[in-house]
């Protein structure tokens, strides 16, 4: 039973041995949201002996008291951040997305769910995953809760399709494997030239950034960026850039504000008639641009050197 306002929870449960009964009181003075800690403890005690429960909560921000019928009790004070408890509770209630869920996502993509809605049944999926129907169903639910999968329950199964986030998650996994098996990771991105808002000119010329550009990139960039709108295919491929080691431009601050870091990926720019390098794809940590927007810096004004106008298509070769 939960007492409103006090954030104290009580529950009764078997210790797991069948011979002892425990009264459980869990007090949490730090959580900013209502988490049913007692239920979490109760489930743990039902499955495991008391010492196992004690170990399970050793890194949680709660005070848990297990009291036997004879009146003997022990209390453990937990002082770690609340995120630890939230993470454990999420794992125990099936909210996390781990390697098993990613394996399921990959299997669905291989079935065609990357490009269109695909019908699946939990029984068939469970057999292919070597898991129970309940486990397969839980994995689908976790993927949906995480925004990686869209589901529609129909009379004879489920229609599933990877979301944009789901596709990017697999692209990121793919990029990791490329780093393992390929010595020189690379990705080609296609986009059309667009006009920016002029923000690139302002930020590039700030001393805190410009000094690092010169030192770490080996050139003084032109005061402005080449803005590109990527094709749908290149938006999907963009996650592969995580396999490439960027040049980090550190964040800094002045008397008025702080400025976030940026990451520069070595690149060359291919226009209709010529190719230009050196250049860098710049990815500020703080940006209002979406995944479809790409910014490129170079020592010269790329529009003039490559004779580009809005709407022209270019290919950005990003590599280490």
Swiss-Prot record:
Protein name: Riboflavin kinase
Encoding gene per record: ribK
Organism whose genome encodes this protein: Haloarcula marismortui (strain ATCC 43049 / DSM 3752 / JCM 8966 / VKM B-1809)
Alphabetical UniProt keywords: Flavoprotein, FMN, Kinase, Magnesium, Metal-binding, Nucleotide-binding, Transferase
Task performed by this protein: Catalyzes the CTP-dependent phosphorylation of riboflavin (vitamin B2) to form flavin mononucleotide (FMN).
Binding site for CDP: 196-201, 300-303
The reaction(s) this protein catalyses: riboflavin + CTP = CDP + FMN + H(+)
EC code(s) of this entry: 2.7.1.161
Region feature H-T-H motif-like, mapped onto this chain: 1-186
Binding site for FMN: 287, 295
Biased composition regions of type Low complexity, renumbered to the chain: 11-23
Region (Disordered): 1-25
């Amino acid at each position: 039973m939960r007492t409103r306002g006090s954030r104290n929870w009580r529950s009764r449960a078997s210790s797991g041995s069948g011979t002892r009964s425990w009264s459980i009181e869990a007090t949490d003075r730090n959580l900013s949201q209502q988490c049913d800690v007692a239920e979490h403890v109760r489930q743990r005690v039902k499955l495991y002996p008391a010492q196992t429960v004690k170990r399970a909560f050793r890194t949680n921000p709660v005070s848990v008291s297990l009291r036997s019928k004879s009146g003997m009790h022990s209390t453990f004070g937990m002082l770690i951040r609340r995120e630890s408890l939230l993470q454990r509770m999420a794992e125990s209630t099936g909210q996390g997305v781990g390697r098993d869920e990613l394996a399921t996502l990959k299997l669905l993509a291989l079935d065609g769910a990357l490009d269109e809605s695909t019908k699946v049944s939990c029984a068939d999926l469970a057999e292919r995953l070597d898991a129970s129907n309940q486990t397969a169903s839980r994995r689908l639910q976790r993927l949906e809760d995480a925004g990686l999968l869209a589901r529609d329950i129909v009379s004879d199964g489920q229609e599933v399709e990877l979301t944009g986030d789901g596709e990017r998650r697999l692209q990121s996994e793919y990029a990791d494997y490329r780093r393992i098996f390929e010595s020189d990771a690379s990705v080609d991105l296609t986009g059309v030239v667009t006009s920016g808002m002029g923000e690139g000119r302002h930020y590039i010329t700030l001393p805190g950034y410009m000094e690092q550009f010169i030192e770490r990139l080996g050139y003084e960039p032109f005061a402005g960026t080449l803005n590109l709108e990527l094709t749908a295919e290149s938006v999907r491929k963009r996650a592969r850039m995580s396999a490439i080691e960027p040049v980090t431009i550190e964040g800094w601050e002045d008397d008025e504000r702080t400025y976030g870091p940026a990451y520069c990926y070595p690149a060359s720019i291919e226009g209709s008639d010529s190719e230009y390098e050196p250049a860098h794809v710049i990815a500020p940590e703080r940006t209002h641009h979406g995944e479809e927007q790409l910014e490129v810096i170079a020592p010269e004004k790329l529009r003039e050197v490559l004779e580009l106008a809005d709407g022209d298509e270019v290919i950005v070769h990003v590599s280490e």
